[in-house]
Amino acid sequence: MVQYDNRYTYEGGNPYLRPCIINNVDFNAVYDWLLFNAGYNYIDNPMVWVATLYQGKDIVFLRNINFNHRQDVYASIVASPRFGWYNPMAEIDYSQSFLHTDGFDINKPSNRPCFNFRLNNRFNITRSLKAFLNMRYKTSQLNDLQYTKPFARVDVKLTKSFLNDALEIGVYANDLFKTDKERWTMYGSHTIMTKDCYGYGRCVGMTVSYNFNTAKSKYKGTGAGNAEKRRL
């Protein structure tokens, strides 16, 4: 079956796909407010979204194809300390994939490591007034055959609760500096596809929520999850 996207792009299935087998080793360690994770994947017959030419014409044909194998290595460290009214969460992630394309006429960039940096800040100004400043930066990444350029994002939010924390009103602004862009290049067999655009994630808004389960009673429950729901 072939799906028509536009005059230059088709999509289709592949009846000759074989199942992939994933072998994984993962390690986790937690100490107080510090968390560490590292792992390794070895994937036999990985299914990869590939662009080729359709019947030798100037038309890109996208479908899944089995490659020989792929190896992934990754690690992350997360720190969530508490300093009274200030609660930060810092995260650093490392990942790198090695897709073996032997036997395929595909000229892709060399594999390179990818780093993701995240810093979420929570400020408990008063018991009912909280501010949030979330920042993220991700370096360039080669995922299978798609190279993605770096991007960054900054979000802010302010919340105020009323009526013994039953009512909460919040205002927020996402992607303050308009830096969360979608920019990538996909390498295929005699084809290269690129995209460089902004997804219009920059916005401001307001939220209003009301919790109907703040009172303790044997019928309504204890509201044990309310604090966690407000945090999220």
Which residues make up each language-model segment?
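Outer-membrane beta-barrel signature, preferentially recognizing the C-terminal barrel domain
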Residues: 1-44, 60-73, 199-202
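Outer-membrane beta-barrel translocator domains and adjoining extracellular loop/strand segments
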Residues: 1-3, 7-10, 42, 46-55, ...
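Residues on the lipid-exposed face of transmembrane beta-strands in outer-membrane beta-barrel proteins
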Residues: 17, 25-31, 75-83, 94, ...
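Repeated loop/turn-to-beta-strand initiation elements of outer-membrane beta-barrel proteins
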Residues: 33-38, 85-90, 127-133, 164-169, ...
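Structural signature of outer-membrane beta-barrel domains
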Residues: 34, 41-45, 84, 95-99, ...
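Gram-negative outer-membrane beta-barrel transporters
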Residues: 42, 61, 66-138
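C-terminal beta-barrel architecture of Gram-negative outer-membrane proteins
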Residues: 94-99, 115-162, 174-177, 186, ...
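C-terminal beta-signal and adjacent terminal beta-strands/loops
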Residues: 162-232
